[in-house]
Amino acid sequence: MKKPARMNAALLAAAWLLAAPCAADAAGPDAETARLIAELGLQESATALADRPGWAPPKTVVIPAADAARLAWMQAAAPGVTLLPAKDRAEAAALATDADAVIGFCTPEVLDAGARLRWIQVLSAGVERCVGIPGFAARGIALSNMQKVAGPVMSEHVLAFLFGLTRGLATYVPLQAQGVWKDDAVPDARMWSIEGKTMLVVGLGGIGTETAKRAHALGMNVIAVRNSGRTGPPYVAEVGLGADLIAFAARADVIVNTLPLTAETKQLFDHVFFDAAKRGALFINVGRGASVVTADLIAALEDGRIGGAGLDVTDPEPLPADHPLWRAPNVLITPHVSASTDLGEEPRWLIARENLRRFAAGGKLLSEVDVGRGY
């Protein structure tokens, strides 16, 4: 079976370079977009935009600036809508005064200027900055994101941390830089075989699901916690609710946080959590840095309650050069790059274009955010 989201970048590029305005563009997604939607399992909103109060066909949409071929490809999805390219946030705010929607920009300035805004498409999975803008929820603006688009590559980043921590790379890579051959630098007890180990995935959305799938394929026993119910895919042995987090943590050799940042998840991983975790467990975070009390994590690493950490996100971020987290034992840190990929931006453009088509037609958006819940 083809690996999710591992599409040929050249084919994706050709999809928009060769596209031309036609009736089919307004009628439904093209084959490449339909395949991407199916592979990622993207969900559409329950209610069509045309069935919501105050609906009227849109006239103007602000989009990120791009070359002429890209703009023509976007325009083909919404022939009756004027597209206004913006090269940065300031230009997007200036253009938003006459816009019905904005793709790629969600800032206080855009919200203040855009009195007519009815839809915003962000080009990331995280929406905490957008929904955190004062008054956003009261505006009733439909918000869609890129949930699941980065799930496959971010789950691979989780595995990179997993292998790095279980094979001593946090110790051996610095020794390599020093030209030191020391085959006993990492005790055998820390050189894990991951087969048969238990992984707890906290948050079973796009990233969590892809992580669970890969961990199961490696022979791990996968358990998970989510808020939406106790059901999950067949490769997850057991699914608990938020109230089960502490009990599940006590059983896990590896804990992976994929949660978005909300009022409920902020500083969720604190000394109480680390005290309850299985001693020596590994902690991997590709969710949000602010979901962790950093001082508590450092303390847990220093006294061995947590055996190591792989962190793509931190609090604060960027992490200052003199921050003690850099020097905590058995830690791998990457600078919020787990979504980076050689696939480029094509999948995001495909989803943005499809949602533009749906918005222009008054249809059901893909990956609409529950603004009240924050994801």
Q: Can you say where each PLM-predicted feature lies in the sequence?
A:
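Glycine-rich Rossmann-fold phosphate-binding loop(s) that bind the pyrophosphate
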Residues: 204-205
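Rossmann-like dinucleotide-binding domain for NAD(H)/NADP(H)
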Residues: 143, 280, 286-375
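Rossmann-like adenosine-cofactor binding region
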Residues: 228-324
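N-terminal Rossmann-fold NAD(P) dinucleotide-binding loop
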Residues: 208-209
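Oxidoreductase and adenylate-handling cofactor-binding alpha/beta cores
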Residues: 155-174, 216-220, 350-363
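Phosphate-binding beta-alpha-beta segment of Rossmann-like dinucleotide-binding domains, i.e.
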Residues: 138-198
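Bacterial N-terminal signal peptides
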Residues: 10-20
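An N-terminal-biased, well-structured beta-alpha scaffold segment characteristic
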Residues: 27-144, 272
